[in-house]
């Protein structure tokens, strides 16, 4: 685990974005941890979040031309990511996001920002069922652009209803790489370094043993 990944985990815990306990997921599973990126909700939070996304993008080595944020949660993530790329890596990358509803006045259409063209890096908070990715792929394909990759905050590394995860399904269906700032394995490694979090470590490991990929 890299130092910036450890810092991201601590950032998420401090902001109560990452919590430990017992949580019922939409799937009905009882999870010993919960990640709610919506609680990154101040200017300072977003500035720091953008730096982590930018760091993960640069480290990945994936070649891309534009950052796309699917509505709604992906919009501030895309914005803060390109600001961080400009401020910290001297990379002036265009960005774009979609509206859920098309406008029939002003600039019109469903897209806001730079033209959706070239190699697209899609950014979002998490992938649960992959629905937002599939909707975004329809938009990207309609503009004859190509999906270069997907970046999310946390890869839960757990099976969906079948034998593979929603992330693995996206990689299989669209032939792209899905990367994350942290994975469940890195979260387990972090907990193992913290004696005071031993109970959470036991619960998360048991969950990974049952549902992990």
UniProtKB/Swiss-Prot annotation:
5-phospho-alpha-D-ribose 1-diphosphate binds at residues 26, 72-73, 99-100, 103, 105, 124-132. Orotate binds at residues 34-35, 128, 156. It catalyses: orotidine 5'-phosphate + diphosphate = orotate + 5-phospho-alpha-D-ribose 1-diphosphate. Keywords: Glycosyltransferase, Magnesium, Pyrimidine biosynthesis, Transferase. Catalyzes the transfer of a ribosyl phosphate group from 5-phosphoribose 1-diphosphate to orotate, leading to the formation of orotidine monophosphate (OMP). GO terms for biological process: 'de novo' pyrimidine nucleobase biosynthetic process; 'de novo' UMP biosynthetic process; pyrimidine ribonucleoside biosynthetic process. Its cofactor is Mg(2+). Pathway: Pyrimidine metabolism; UMP biosynthesis via de novo pathway; UMP from orotate: step 1/2. GO terms for molecular function: magnesium ion binding; orotate phosphoribosyltransferase activity. NCBIfam families: pyrE (TIGR00336). The keyword Transferase applies. Belongs to the purine/pyrimidine phosphoribosyltransferase family. PyrE subfamily. It comes from the Bacteria. This is Orotate phosphoribosyltransferase. The lineage of its organism: Bacteria, Pseudomonadati, Pseudomonadota, Gammaproteobacteria, Enterobacterales. Its EC number is 2.4.2.10.
């Amino acid at each position: 685990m890299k130092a910036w990944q450890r810092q991201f985990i601590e950032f998420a815990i401090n902001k109560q974005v990452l919590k430990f306990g017992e949580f019922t997921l939409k799937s009905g599973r009882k999870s010993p941890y919960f990640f709610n990126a919506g609680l990154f909700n101040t200017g300072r939070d977003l500035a720091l979040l953008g730096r982590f996304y930018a760091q993960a993008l640069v480290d990945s080595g994936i070649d891309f031309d534009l950052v796309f944020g699917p509505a709604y949660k992906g919009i501030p993530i895309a914005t803060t990511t390109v600001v961080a790329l400009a401020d910290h890596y001297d990379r002036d990358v265009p960005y774009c996001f979609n509206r859920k509803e098309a406008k029939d006045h002003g600039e019109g259409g469903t897209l806001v920002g730079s033209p959706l063209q070239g190699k697209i890096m899609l950014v979002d908070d998490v992938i649960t069922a992959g629905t937002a990715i599939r909707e975004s792929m329809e938009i990207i394909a309609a503009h004859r652009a190509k999906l270069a990759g997907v970046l999310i905050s946390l890869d839960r590394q757990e099976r969906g209803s079948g034998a593979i995860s929603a992330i693995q399904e996206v990689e299989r269906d669209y032939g792209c790489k899905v990367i994350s700032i942290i994975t469940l394995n890195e979260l387990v490694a972090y907990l193992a370094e913290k004696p005071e979090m031993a109970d959470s470590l036991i619960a998360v490991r048991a969950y990974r043993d049952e549902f992990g990929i």
